[in-house]
Structure formats: C-alpha cells, structure tokens
Amino acid sequence: MNSNKKQISHISLILLSLFTIFIQVAAAQSVYVGKSGPEGKVLRKYIEPAELKKLVENPVDTIWIIDVRSEKAYLEGHIPTAKSYPSGTIMSRLNEIPIDTYLIIYCTVGGMARIVSKKLKKAGYKRYMDWGGLSRWEWEKETGF
C-alpha cells in the first residue's frame, strides 16, 4: 500500500510540475494582432517595458509609438521617439498615419489609449497596440519635440 501512495505522490508531483510549466509557457505567449510585418514579425497586443525600450533604442520606420496625451503633457516628458497625437485631434489627423504602420498607443495611465485604440480599429487600423500608461516607462523621458 505504501508503494501505491508513493507512486500516486510522484505522479501528482509530475502532473503539478507539468501544469506549472504549461501555465508559465502560456503566460509568456502573446496574442498577436494584424498581419505579418517586416521580416515576418507581427505586433503583439502586449510587450514588456524593456522590449519597448529596445524598440526606442533601435527604431523601426514601420512601428510608431504614439502619445495621445495633451501636447503640454507630451512636451513635459514622453517616451523617446514617440510622436504626439493628442486624443482630441488624432482622428482628424489619420491622413498623417499610414494605415499599414504598427502603432503602439499610450497615454498617462491607460484609459485614453484604450479609447483611441478602439477608434483606430473602427477607422480600419489593424496593426495597433494599447500599451497603457506612461507610468510603465521606467527610464528617462524626452522633453520638447
């Protein structure tokens, strides 16, 4: 009987370990949006701040970081390389944003970025990501234009 209990314990431990690994792998996977981009890469719905920092350090022409806060807030400090398109004016300026460009949208805490992302979707944009708020940016901000 003791042998059976040990076997069940070992099997339970193995199953628990496999389940834990599965959850970790699933959590690390991102859901993708849009079609293949440069070199077959696609824009995910979520990237870590460190990944965005790498993008800032090595900008790609087909990926724009869009700040939808007020121009005043943008001037006071924004993610380097971000372009200012305040939420109140972005929809009237869509002619400036190529529809096939990947867009990473952020605001102060995330609410306005979510709203703008939904508007972009309605306008036909498929390659966008609501990054949330500037508070997630841990590094030095750029000021001015």
Residue ranges of model-derived segments:
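Rhodanese-like catalytic fold shared by cysteine-dependent sulfurtransferases
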Residues: N2-L13, Q24-K53, P59-I63, K72-Y102, ...
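Structural scaffold elements adjacent to functional motifs in cytosolic proteins
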Residues: I65-D67
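N-terminal leader/targeting signatures
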Residues: L15-L18
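Short, surface-exposed ligand- or partner-binding patches at beta-edge/loop junctions that are enriched
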Residues: Y106-C107
